[in-house]
């Protein structure tokens, strides 16, 4: 997941300092004893989980805290600190959070600054080895486990099988962005094309960043290019109204689309594998806004997933998002925190929360529970995409007011992209 948030200017000097410090104190390796069981009953752990929210933990987070508490005897509280806040807490050597869960784009910063606890654990090492390679690439620091993956997701263009039959579209025919937009805009049938324009733009922007910016050390990052402005104008040239979220030309937004999850009405839509819970053709009293998803397997039986279109022929991989857990190097409960991570690693889907229950973590198909429907074509579609996926390894902390002003007509395309470039340059050179 790529999180972009305005960085308070008063905090910038501290954030920059973080990139050159060693973490404030030596990080000792933690080894969980396998020879003697330790009773952690009564221990309280604070987990920074941005989806679970502040205490008490909700069911929307990365982990199933209720089940973890039952099985470990540990009480969990959760907190929500965003990127800038997390960095400041680590810089201040704060010990109140025991486990942080962060986006993959944040990991390189924490790794280079030494803000992690090295882990020695056969259980976690075996777990990481079983995950997709794209996850293991960010798990190790100086040959020690430092960051444990807890989520992996990839977005796709979702197309009903019936629409594929009608249009004879194939992944190859809409492999590139312009071809995809042409397919949608020239379609003259009764189906409606849906998308989530902001999320689609983020995925295309990730392609651009992965393709051109392998690191930010040279402080030379350029968004004022015809290629980037083409993405910007094609995807973001829409306005929102009081009663409806806008969408890219030729589309309706899938959050307001009455039939975006209906294989009989949609031409295409946008989503990840977790979208499965929201797809059904069943409507209550033919009301398009009231649909019955309970027990529906329509997603697995009636839909296929095509890769997000490429912005150019130079793009050779799919853009994915992930989240990693790490033990706060300043935590006073490192052993208990490691025990929790080992518990999760021993049976991932048992302890996965709502935000990660559909994560395709593993390279072995037999590792997935029944609700993944691994024999379905759409599972194979997503699974194959992840075999050739890359994660964004940095994040530009910008508020993206440029997009708001562009869509409001306050800035031209050139002015909007120049404003974003200005924000990026400030971040690079502080």
Positions of predicted regions on the chain:
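Conserved N-terminal structural module of periplasmic/extracytoplasmic solute-binding proteins
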Residues: 5-9, 19-108, 335, 351-353, ...
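Extracytoplasmic "Venus flytrap"/periplasmic binding protein-like
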Residues: 70-131, 167-168, 260, 267-268, ...
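Hinge/lid segment of periplasmic solute-binding proteins
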Residues: 102-159, 300-309
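Extracytoplasmic/periplasmic solute-binding protein
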Residues: 146-150, 155, 178-224, 229-230
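Glycine-centered hinge/linker elements that transmit conformational signals in sensory
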Residues: 218-254
């Amino acid at each position: 997941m790529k999180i972009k948030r305005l960085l308070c200017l008063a905090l910038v000097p501290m954030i920059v300092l973080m990139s050159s410090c060693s973490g404030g104190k030596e990080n000792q390796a933690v080894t969980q004893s396998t020879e003697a069981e330790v009773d952690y009953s009564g221990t309280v752990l604070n987990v920074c989980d941005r989806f679970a929210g502040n205490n008490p933990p909700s069911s929307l987070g990365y982990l199933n805290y209720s089940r973890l508490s039952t099985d470990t005897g540990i009480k969990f509280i959760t907190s929500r600190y965003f990127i800038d806040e997390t960095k400041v807490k680590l810089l201040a050597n704060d010990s109140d959070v025991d486990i942080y869960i962060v986006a993959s784009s944040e990991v390189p910063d924490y790794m280079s600054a030494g803000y992690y606890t090295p882990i020695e654990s056969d259980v976690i090492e075996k777990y990481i080895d079983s995950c997709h390679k794209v996850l293991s690439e960010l798990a190790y620091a100086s040959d020690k486990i430092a960051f444990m993956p807890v989520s992996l997701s990839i977005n796709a263009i979702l197309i009903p099988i019936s629409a594929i039959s009608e249009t004879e579209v194939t992944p190859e025919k809409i492999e590139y962005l312009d071809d995809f937009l042409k397919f949608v805009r020239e379609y003259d049938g009764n189906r409606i094309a849906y998308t989530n324009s902001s999320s689609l733009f983020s995925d295309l922007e990730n392609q651009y960043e992965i393709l051109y910016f392998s690191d930010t050390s040279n402080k030379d990052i350029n968004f004022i290019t015809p290629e980037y402005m083409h993405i910007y104008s094609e995807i973001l040239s829409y306005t929102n109204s009081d009663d409806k979220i806008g969408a890219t030309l030729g589309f309706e937004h899938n959050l307001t689309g009455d039939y975006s999850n209906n294989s009989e009405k949609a031409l295409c839509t946008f989503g990840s594998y977790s979208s499965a819970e929201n797809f059904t053709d069943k409507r209550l009293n033919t009301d398009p806004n009231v649909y019955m998803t309970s027990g529906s397997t329509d997603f697995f039986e009636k839909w296929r997933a095509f890769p997000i279109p490429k912005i150019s022929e130079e793009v050779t991989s799919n853009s994915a998002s992930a989240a990693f857990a790490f033990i706060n190097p300043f935590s006073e409960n490192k052993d208990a925190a490691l025990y929790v991570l080992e518990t999760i690693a021993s049976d991932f889907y048992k302890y996965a929360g709502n935000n990660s229950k559909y994560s395709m973590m593993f390279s072995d198909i037999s590792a997935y529970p029944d609700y993944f429907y691994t024999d379905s074509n759409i599972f194979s579609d997503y699974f194959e995409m992840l075999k050739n996926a890359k994660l964004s390894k940095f994040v530009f902390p910008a508020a993206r007011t440029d997009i708001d002003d562009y869509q409001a007509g306050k800035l031209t395309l050139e002015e909007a992209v120049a404003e974003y470039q200005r924000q990026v340059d400030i971040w690079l050179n502080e």
